[in-house]
Curated annotation (Swiss-Prot):
Family recorded in the similarity comment: Belongs to the NrdR family.
Cofactor binding description: Binds 1 zinc ion.
Keywords carried by this UniProt record: ATP-binding, DNA-binding, Metal-binding, Nucleotide-binding, Repressor, Transcription, Transcription regulation, Zinc, Zinc-finger
Keyword Zinc: yes
Zinc fingers (unnamed), renumbered ranges: 3-34
Cofactor list: Zn(2+)
The keyword Zinc appears for this protein: yes
GO molecular function term, any single one: DNA binding
Its job: Negatively regulates transcription of bacterial ribonucleotide reductase nrd genes and operons by binding to NrdR-boxes.
Region of interest (Disordered), ranges: 148-170
Biological process terms in GO annotation: negative regulation of DNA-templated transcription
Name of the protein described by the UniProt record: Transcriptional repressor NrdR
InterPro entries, alphabetized: ATP-cone_dom, NrdR-like_N, RNR_NrdR-like
Species this protein is from: Streptomyces griseus subsp. griseus (strain JCM 4626 / CBS 651.72 / NBRC 13350 / KCC S-0626 / ISP 5235)
Amino acid sequence: MHCPFCRHPDSRVVDSRTTDDGTSIRRRRQCPDCSRRFTTVETCSLMVVKRSGVTEPFSRTKVISGVRKACQGRPVTEDALAKLGQRVEEAVRATGSAELTTHDVGLAILGPLQELDLVAYLRFASVYRAFDSLEDFEAAIVELRAQRPSAEDRGSGETLEVPAPAIAAD
């Protein structure tokens, strides 16, 4: 690594630590020529292959931005969005692959988003899964109702009734 001060082509690592979120390594280096110290941060590059075939670096900010649109008007905090972004990044990095498709990233978003807010989940899923009819929405809602734990499973004595949507007959 070149010294940023004197451009000497070598440096010595003085200290090495992982960052708080564990996604990168912070190294303290010292130049053998000018003896000045500097810090570098190393991360594994994670690339996303888009539908068009274009490859771009994974962006947690882009994930949060997309989810924020689905959460618009919902009681979801910025802190919750940041945690979701971190969970998604951890999930995609855990695959061990250096390249992912946008489909893989979308799948990684759906799980944490479903836990965060069901309405936002439906909004995101409608775009991600390309819903093009009311039947697609109804099928997703039926699937969510089937996954929802019953009142006994949650430990309360109450029963939760989720009414089916009323559909007007023409």
